[in-house]
Amino acid sequence: MKEGIHPKNYRPVVFQDLSNGDKFIVRSCIVTSETIKMEDGHEYPLSKVEITNASHPFFTGQQMLLDTAGRVERFNKRFGKMGKKS
Protein backbone atom coordinates (compact mmCIF):
# COMPACT_ATOMS: atom_id res chain seq x y z
CA MET A 1 0.00 0.00 0.00
CA LYS A 2 1.14 3.54 -0.65
CA GLU A 3 2.16 5.47 2.40
CA GLY A 4 0.78 8.91 3.18
CA ILE A 5 -2.46 8.64 1.20
CA HIS A 6 -4.67 7.13 3.90
CA PRO A 7 -6.40 9.18 6.62
CA LYS A 8 -4.74 9.24 10.03
CA ASN A 9 -7.99 9.27 12.03
CA TYR A 10 -9.50 6.06 10.59
CA ARG A 11 -10.78 4.44 13.77
CA PRO A 12 -13.78 2.59 15.26
CA VAL A 13 -16.77 4.92 15.73
CA VAL A 14 -20.20 4.18 17.25
CA PHE A 15 -23.15 5.19 15.09
CA GLN A 16 -26.37 5.43 17.11
CA ASP A 17 -29.75 5.25 15.40
CA LEU A 18 -31.91 7.95 17.01
CA SER A 19 -35.21 6.36 15.98
CA ASN A 20 -34.71 3.03 17.76
CA GLY A 21 -31.51 3.38 19.82
CA ASP A 22 -29.48 0.67 18.04
CA LYS A 23 -25.71 1.16 18.03
CA PHE A 24 -23.17 0.01 15.44
CA ILE A 25 -19.38 0.08 15.69
CA VAL A 26 -17.92 0.93 12.29
CA ARG A 27 -14.50 2.17 11.22
CA SER A 28 -14.77 5.76 10.01
CA CYS A 29 -12.96 9.10 9.66
CA ILE A 30 -15.94 11.15 10.88
CA VAL A 31 -15.11 13.99 13.26
CA THR A 32 -17.26 13.87 16.42
CA SER A 33 -17.31 15.73 19.71
CA GLU A 34 -19.25 13.14 21.73
CA THR A 35 -18.03 9.80 23.09
CA ILE A 36 -19.79 6.75 24.50
CA LYS A 37 -18.64 3.83 26.64
CA MET A 38 -19.74 0.52 25.14
CA GLU A 39 -20.36 -2.88 26.74
CA ASP A 40 -16.83 -4.03 25.87
CA GLY A 41 -15.44 -1.37 28.24
CA HIS A 42 -13.89 0.83 25.54
CA GLU A 43 -14.82 4.45 24.93
CA TYR A 44 -15.57 5.32 21.30
CA PRO A 45 -16.44 8.51 19.40
CA LEU A 46 -20.23 8.78 18.94
CA SER A 47 -22.12 9.88 15.85
CA LYS A 48 -25.92 10.14 16.07
CA VAL A 49 -27.85 9.45 12.86
CA GLU A 50 -31.56 9.83 12.11
CA ILE A 51 -32.12 6.49 10.39
CA THR A 52 -30.14 3.32 9.63
CA ASN A 53 -30.84 -0.06 8.09
CA ALA A 54 -32.18 -1.14 11.51
CA SER A 55 -35.04 1.35 11.33
CA HIS A 56 -35.59 2.14 7.64
CA PRO A 57 -38.91 0.69 6.40
CA PHE A 58 -37.28 -0.80 3.29
CA PHE A 59 -34.91 -2.95 5.36
CA THR A 60 -37.35 -3.79 8.18
CA GLY A 61 -40.07 -5.04 5.82
CA GLN A 62 -42.60 -2.43 6.93
CA GLN A 63 -42.59 -0.75 3.54
CA MET A 64 -46.01 0.17 2.17
CA LEU A 65 -46.60 -0.53 -1.51
CA LEU A 66 -49.15 1.67 -3.24
CA ASP A 67 -51.48 0.19 -5.81
CA THR A 68 -51.15 2.65 -8.67
CA ALA A 69 -52.54 0.31 -11.34
CA GLY A 70 -56.12 1.10 -10.32
CA ARG A 71 -55.45 4.82 -10.53
CA VAL A 72 -53.95 4.54 -14.02
CA GLU A 73 -56.89 2.49 -15.27
CA ARG A 74 -59.36 5.00 -13.80
CA PHE A 75 -57.46 7.88 -15.43
CA ASN A 76 -57.45 6.14 -18.81
CA LYS A 77 -61.16 5.37 -18.53
CA ARG A 78 -61.96 9.03 -17.83
CA PHE A 79 -59.55 10.79 -20.15
CA GLY A 80 -58.29 8.14 -22.58
CA LYS A 81 -60.82 9.03 -25.26
CA MET A 82 -59.85 12.72 -25.36
CA GLY A 83 -56.60 12.22 -27.25
CA LYS A 84 -58.00 9.88 -29.91
CA LYS A 85 -59.25 11.19 -33.25
CA SER A 86 -62.44 9.69 -34.66
Swiss-Prot record:
SUPFAM superfamilies linked: L28p-like
GO biological process: translation
GO molecular function, one term: structural constituent of ribosome
Record bears the keyword Phosphoprotein: no
GO cellular component labels: ribonucleoprotein complex; ribosome
Gene3D superfamilies assigned: Ribosomal protein L31 (4.10.830.30)
Superkingdom of origin: Bacteria
NCBIfam families reported in the protein's UniProt record: L31, PRK01678.1
Taxonomic placement: Bacteria, Pseudomonadati, Chlorobiota, Chlorobiia, Chlorobiales
Subunit relationships: Part of the 50S ribosomal subunit.
PROSITE patterns: RIBOSOMAL_L31
UniProt keyword Iron present: no
Alphabetical UniProt keywords: Ribonucleoprotein, Ribosomal protein
The organism of origin for this protein: Chloroherpeton thalassium (strain ATCC 35110 / GB-78)
Family recorded in the similarity comment: Belongs to the bacterial ribosomal protein bL31 family. Type B subfamily.
Name of the protein: Large ribosomal subunit protein bL31B
